[in-house]
Amino acid sequence: MMSQQEEMIEHVEGAFPVAIPLENPPERTPTLLKQRVLNQLCVQFGIAEAEVLLPGPNDFADRPPYGFVAINRQMCLSGAIPPFNEFLRQILLRLTISPFQLHPNGYAILMGLCVLFRRTLDRLPSFEEICYLCTFAKNKDHPSIVLVRGARNRKLILDLPESAHGFLNQYFYIRCPAEFYADWRVGSEIFFLFFL
């Protein structure tokens, strides 16, 4: 039996089948974010404090409370500010992962491509264009996290950071729209076609 969130995702046009939830990912760690820092992030990025929760010592990013999704500080610093734009929502749905599972460098690259396409073509890039311009990969240290890099010989944006230290333990929960995967996912079969 599917949850209400999974039923809504399945009905979204162009979405892939619901992916399998991850059990005990190796990246599971409690947050080190403090309430004072969370309040500062809310003010800095225009996030309503009523929409966020600071996880407790026994809470983890891969299993947020119902109606919430885990967000890390570096995502906001990269320009991916909740509730996200439609472009990011569709990319995450197509990849069948939760927002936290996309490495913060991926948000910097994707948001950079959004700005570039908007300014030059007056539109957002399609998923197919993103797959042509970027490579998606996982590494052995963090197999639940998806890395994004500019494809070799097709980098439109240069000198973006390739790493973001400490993002796994600086997260909070934010109320999420129904079309997000909240729990961490393995990813659908189509997802792995784009991985190197």
Protein language model features and the residues they cover:
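Residue-register detector that marks a fixed positional context within folded domains
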Residues: 1-196
